[in-house]
């Protein structure tokens, strides 16, 4: 029997979701950073800096950036760990990974990169001090499996940080829906020449677990001291959990 999952509001086979998500990011990769700036008014850069602060990463530590895409977090983590540290930039999508790698090279920095599935990480157990995923978890087919893999590669005492869109403050829901389903696709069509991918973005946010649901998923995966920080009227949440 074919196993199904969500691709936005559609129910599709797991194989089809992987193919569809790959198509989305192949399409938007070249305009990804520009669209992020336009969609969030540049706020995504502040959210990512906050994620770095909350991670507590220090000089000399090892960091795994999952779904690292255009390397926003990897670039910031590099500033924290310094020359004695190690930052791995990973993504399942080659188009996104190539842009991130080339960006870091243009900045004069070379980091190890790996195209890999977050559900099957090619790293040893108990290796990293911090694992991060920003705006990538909702695209994963088996979020529970990916979270368990993140736990596996963390060393005891290490933390995971998950930055993701979440459930907005209810009084703003109608305005947010108007923005998500009318403005975003129009903006995507104008700037990235792809309305459908940004329609998927809006839909994928709506079917992603709430703040409390994701907290429970992380706890079930084995993370401890899980907490979250609501940002931008709850439209975005940063979750943090530890491995002990």
UniProtKB/Swiss-Prot annotation:
It is an enzyme of class 2 (transferase). NCBIfam families: MenG_MenH_UbiE, PRK00216.1-1. Keywords: Menaquinone biosynthesis, Methyltransferase, S-adenosyl-L-methionine, Transferase, Ubiquinone biosynthesis. Belongs to the class I-like SAM-binding methyltransferase superfamily. MenG/UbiE family. This is Ubiquinone/menaquinone biosynthesis C-methyltransferase UbiE. Pfam families: Ubie_methyltran (PF01209). S-adenosyl-L-methionine binds at residues 70, 91, 117-118. Methyltransferase required for the conversion of demethylmenaquinol (DMKH2) to menaquinol (MKH2) and the conversion of 2-polyprenyl-6-methoxy-1,4-benzoquinol (DDMQH2) to 2-polyprenyl-3-methyl-6-methoxy-1,4-benzoquinol (DMQH2). GO terms for molecular function: 2-methoxy-6-polyprenyl-1,4-benzoquinol methyltransferase activity; demethylmenaquinone methyltransferase activity. Its EC number is 2.1.1.163, 2.1.1.201. Pathway: Quinol/quinone metabolism; menaquinone biosynthesis; menaquinol from 1,4-dihydroxy-2-naphthoate: step 2/2; Cofactor biosynthesis; ubiquinone biosynthesis. It comes from Nitrosospira multiformis (strain ATCC 25196 / NCIMB 11849 / C 71). InterPro entries: SAM-dependent_MTases_sf, UbiE/COQ5_MeTrFase, UbiE/COQ5_MeTrFase_CS. The gene is ubiE.
């Amino acid at each position: 029997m074919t196993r199904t999952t969500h691709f936005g509001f559609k129910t599709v086979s797991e194989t089809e979701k992987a193919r569809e998500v790959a198509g989305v990011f192949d399409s938007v990769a070249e305009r990804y950073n520009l669209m992020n700036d336009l969609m969030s008014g540049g706020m995504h850069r502040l959210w990512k800096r906050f994620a770095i602060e909350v991670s507590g990463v220090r000089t000399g530590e090892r960091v795994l950036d999952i779904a690292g895409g255009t390397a926003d977090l990897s670039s910031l983590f590099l500033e924290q760990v310094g020359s004695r540290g190690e930052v791995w930039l990973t993504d399942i999508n080659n188009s996104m990974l190539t842009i991130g790698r080339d960006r870091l090279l243009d900045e004069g920095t070379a980091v190890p990169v790996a195209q890999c599935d977050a559900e099957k990480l090619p790293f040893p157990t108990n290796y990293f001090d911090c694992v991060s995923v920003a705006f990538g978890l909702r695209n994963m087919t088996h979020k529970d499996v990916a979270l368990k893999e993140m736990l596996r590669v963390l060393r005891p005492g290490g933390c995971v940080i998950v930055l993701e869109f979440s459930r907005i403050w209810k009084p703003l829901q109608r305005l947010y829906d108007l923005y998500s389903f009318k403005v975003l696709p129009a903006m995507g069509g104008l700037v990235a020449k792809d309305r459908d991918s940004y329609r998927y973005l809006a839909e994928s946010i709506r079917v992603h677990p709430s703040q409390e649901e994701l907290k429970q998923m992380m706890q079930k995966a084995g993370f401890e001291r899980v907490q979250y920080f609501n940002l931008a009227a709850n439209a975005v949440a940063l979750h943090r959990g530890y491995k002990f």
